[in-house]
């Protein structure tokens, strides 16, 4: 096994300041990649739990460097394609190429009403679209292929959630990511660019570990234990579990894997 299978590669990761995005950045850096990290680092009004901060992004920079990777980190909003383009270009200016895209940025909506629907669609679906769109020209121009990984959710494969517009929007967005993945996988295959999606169950991150999410579990109009229980005896998986899957999809070990929905969910989807 190669110790640093992504040596010389460059990965563009959104939502990289903490949680899953940080785990992806650190794991890919440990595997040899340089990182272009983007995160909004400010609050969205309809999101009830605290989002990332500039200090969180700075901590990711330190962790990536400790793992042996170079990193360019910028604040940017996936809802704003221009800000993503600026962030990506800063990384390209530094590292000279792009090989891996991880469209990870996302928010969880609980009882946020119609504003929640709009914001979760804008971040979790349109933001993924923007991320891929700004990266495609460079990947194609280089002519060396690439790997695009879209972070969806177990909620993108089965129908779960409450009847609140924010929760419905989350399910709709995560299902929509699957459609994007499948279409991109076909469109980009001739350029040897692979596109896949990863579908976590609940992950031990600030998105889940906050008082607002726990309150939502107790008040949502659904059978929470039935709908949110995993098959394997674990309540929450770790960010590194998801990052391991992303690292594999980014590597040559998955060189002929494209168009795949990959659950990393402790059997959550299969139990439905």
UniProtKB/Swiss-Prot annotation:
It is an enzyme of class 1 (oxidoreductase). InterPro entries: NAD(P)-bd_dom_sf, Sc_DH/Rdtase_CS, SDR_fam, SDR_subfam_1. It comes from the Bacteria. Its EC number is 1.-.-.-. Keywords: NAD, Oxidoreductase. Substrate binds at residue 153. The active site is at residue 170. Gene3D superfamilies: NAD(P)-binding Rossmann-like Domain. Transmembrane segments: none annotated. GO terms for molecular function: oxidoreductase activity, acting on the CH-OH group of donors, NAD or NADP as acceptor. NAD(+) binds at residues 12-34, 39-40, 77-78, 104, 174, 203-205. Pfam families: adh_short_C2. Belongs to the short-chain dehydrogenases/reductases (SDR) family. This is Uncharacterized oxidoreductase MT2820. It comes from Mycobacterium tuberculosis (strain CDC 1551 / Oshkosh). The lineage of its organism: Bacteria, Bacillati, Actinomycetota, Actinomycetes, Mycobacteriales.
